[in-house]
């Protein structure tokens, strides 16, 4: 079976092809969110991008954020609902959120050089999804004697080994540069009502730690819904559990269930109409004149 792919525009007007988010991914995300397992949720988001992004490119955190938004739009829903404590529902278009982030993106890469050791290091936005501020996560590339390595394209063990070989003097310069760029630009992402007639602005920072809660909010759903959809598709529609988990998307599951509900309603309405048609007049003397 050939997987359906769709294009996603990321930073610097680049394009990547992605496969759809399946029920197995969505269910696992809901489990991690419900258990508040932030560390493993970050790891799983990274694994989902690695699996579903067909085009292999050097991706920073913003690219990955945009890809996750696209997966949410295509495979789940293009609408984000925010419910406030005062029970006000705000409806937002995820496509508009993604567009706003891309329009306000600006390259933030800076270079640290050491002519003594012939080393050049590029630092900038973090390249992994994280709920913690990991300083060395902001090192993009290291070039030593003309050989350049992109750290986000190698394993953690290889990164640690390369970083351990850097002279202490340049390591200090790198840390200094990273700390100077700690405060990233903030943009107004959207406005929402938190009480009747009262609005607030939600700001987006180009820093993975500050936006992790937003990412969780965008993907949050009721885990019971996932189990309910699974039950209906498997027991009522006779779709195998494997096919449901690994070949169907959340939005496809809901469409199938809605179709089933419509058919059941039509059958019930037809039965009621038939019963009403076949009803005999009640025996009696009739109405008085």
Regions found by a protein language model. Name each.
Residues 1-272:
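An amphipathic, hydrophobic-aromatic interaction surface with interspersed Lys/Arg
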Residues 272-289:
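Short acidic DE-rich linear segments
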């Amino acid at each position: 079976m050939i997987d359906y792919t769709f294009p996603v525009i990321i930073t610097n007007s680049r394009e990547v092809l992605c496969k759809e988010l399946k029920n197995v991914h969505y269910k696992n995300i809901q489990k991690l969110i419900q258990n508040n397992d932030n560390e493993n949720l970050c790891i799983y988001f990274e694994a989902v991008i690695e699996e579903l992004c067909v085009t292999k490119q050097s991706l920073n955190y913003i690219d990955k954020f945009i890809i996750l938004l696209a997966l949410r739009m295509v495979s789940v829903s293009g609408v984000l609902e925010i419910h406030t404590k005062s029970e006000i529902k705000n409806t937002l278009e995820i496509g508009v959120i993604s567009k706003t982030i891309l329009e306000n993106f600006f390259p933030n890469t800076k270079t640290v050089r050491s002519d003594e050791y012939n080393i050049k290091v590029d630092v900038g936005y973090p390249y992994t999804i994280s709920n913690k501020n990991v300083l060395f996560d902001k090192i993009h590339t290291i070039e030593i004697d003309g050989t350049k390595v992109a750290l986000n394209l190698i394993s953690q063990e290889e990164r640690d080994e390369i970083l351990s070989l850097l002279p202490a003097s340049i390591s200090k310069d790198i840390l200094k540069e990273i700390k100077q760029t700690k405060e990233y630009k903030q943009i107004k992402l959207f406005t929402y009502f938190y009480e009747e007639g009262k609005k607030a602005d939600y700001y987006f920072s180009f820093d993975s730690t500050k936006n992790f809660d937003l990412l969780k909010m965008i993907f949050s759903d009721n885990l019971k819904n996932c189990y309910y959809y699974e039950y209906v598709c498997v027991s009522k529609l006779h779709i195998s559990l494997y096919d449901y988990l690994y070949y169907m998307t959340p939005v496809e599951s809901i469409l199938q269930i809605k179709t089933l509900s419509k058919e059941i309603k039509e059958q019930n309405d037809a039965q009621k109409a038939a019963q009403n048609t076949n009803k005999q007049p009640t025996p009696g003397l009739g109405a008085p004149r």
